[in-house]
Structures are given as C-alpha cells and as structure tokens.
Amino acid sequence: MALPIIIDCDPGHDDAIALVLALASPELEVKAITSSAGNQTPEKTLRNVLRMLTLLKRPDIPVAGGAVKPLMRELIIADNVHGESGLDGPALPEPSFAPQSGTAVELMAKTLRESAQPVTIVSTGPQTNVALLLNSHPELHTKIARIVIMGGAMALGNWTPAAEFNIYVDPEAAEIVFQSGIPVVMAGLDVTHKAQIHAADIERFRAIGNPISTIVAELLDFFMEYHKDEKWGFVGAPLHDPCTIAWLLKPEIFTTVERWVGVETQGKYTQGMTVVDYYFLTGNKPNATVMVDVDRQGFVDLLAERLQYYA
C-alpha cells in the first residue's frame, strides 16, 4: 500500500525536483500539495506548484496556497538563489488549473481528516503552514504519522553563520514543529551538502532524454550557478529538498541519529539555529531523527532511475 503524504513546499529548484521524484514513485501517494512563502513570494511559489503539476500532468492533486508571511516576522526570500520566478532556467508551462479556494491549513486538515491511515507531512520550506496546522488542529495530531522536514543543521548555517534558510525564515514555526510530540525527521545541511549533484550527473539526467529529465537538467543548470561561488567549496550543487523524498523511498542510503532538537528564536548571533543535543547534554528525550550522512551515488542513482518513469 502506498504511503500517503502531503507536501508543503516553496518551489524553488530543489522543491520542484522533490515533486518530480515523489510523483515518479508508486510507493508514495501524494494526497495534497500546499505552498509556503520562502524561496520566493507566496504568489510565485503557489504558481510554481501549479506549473510543475501542469508539466507533470497531475492536475488531479489538490493544491492550496499558504501563509503569506512567517508567524511573527517579515518574509525573507531567496531570489538570489532561485531567480525572479523562483524557477528560473527552463521554459515551464503556465498553470492549466486553479488552486483550491481554501487555505493550505484547511486543505491539510481536510486531507488528514479523510485519510484512513496516518499521513506523513513532507515540508521543504519554512515551517509556517505546518505550525499553523498543529496549533489550530490539535485533534488531528494523531492523524500525522511523521513530519519530514528539509531544514536546519547540526553544524553550519547557509543563510547566517548559525542558521539554515528555511528555519531562519520562521524559527518560531520550526520550534512548534520540533516540540509538537509528533515524530520529526530532519534533513539538514549536514546531509544535504553531501547530496551534491555534479556536472556529470546533470548530463546523465539530460541523456535520459524525456521531457521531464530535460527540464530537471535545465533546472540544475541554473541552480548550479549560485553554488559555483568559491566560498561554499562545493564540487556541484547540494540538492536539499529531494533528500526528504529520497529518505522515504530508500532510508538505507542515509545515516541518521536520534537526538533532541530545539530552535533558537532569540539569539543575537544564532536566531534560526537548530540546536542539536548530539552528546545528550540536556537530559531532553530525543524528538527528531537527524540525517547526518548519505550515499551520494545511491542518491543520484535513485534520481536517475525515477526520471525514467517519465519516458
């Protein structure tokens, strides 16, 4: 039986590729997709979800737009990484269908309520929508199997020295998610920076030769440019968000540890930092499965294998 999931995302090149991977995988049943503000403005990320589903010929999946700003802060976007549209690079179709009239939280709640089994929430942007869901629908917590997030880091930040972008955008929301009591799986920079796509991998995807693999290669061509900056020391581009879907499909290619994680919301230098109690110093019970390593080749092979689905 396929695993039911809701994807909350802010496309974003790597979010788009996470959608491609999820919808090529019969092991997963994508019951709804909601958009969050983050990589671009809320209007653009919602439009990008609709453009990707139009491209993938999946207008049957319910879509709803989410919160227009973080819980307690002004919105920050990453247009320097993802371009003016949020998905600069390839020529993507215009949306062929409209989103639902309700909000992301309403669609998530309806999906959870109607599901016969608990649903996994995959969240690849800021945690605003998920936090609003948890706060407004405590009666639905038992319908959530787990929350798999791309966000945070045990070690280094990528937006500030201490903070990863998704968590930095809305640290209060992330803290609600981590302390919710629902199992959380964290794909942070510790693992996503090891899930790099190299130039040769992009050519491998392009050579698959179907329309979707070609678009993925073109998305990666654009995404690669930002990551060529010498300050990162990368060989390729880290494919952050697809790590969440890849973990659901092939957990054996990831190394994880069980740890307590809290989010710093006040610090002078550390706002948005995910504080991981690696050495069990707090006495707090672990609340997260934290990814720390990945078999890079296994990750690339999984992407290549699933891109064949679109032949």
Curated annotation (Swiss-Prot):
Top enzyme category: hydrolase
CDD domains attached to this UniProt entry: nuc_hydro_IU_UC_XIUA
One GO BP: purine nucleoside catabolic process
Pfam families associated with the record: IU_nuc_hydro
SUPFAM superfamilies, per database record: Nucleoside hydrolase
Residues of the active site: 240
Family stated for the protein in its record: Belongs to the IUNH family. RihA subfamily.
Name of the protein this chain belongs to: Pyrimidine-specific ribonucleoside hydrolase RihA
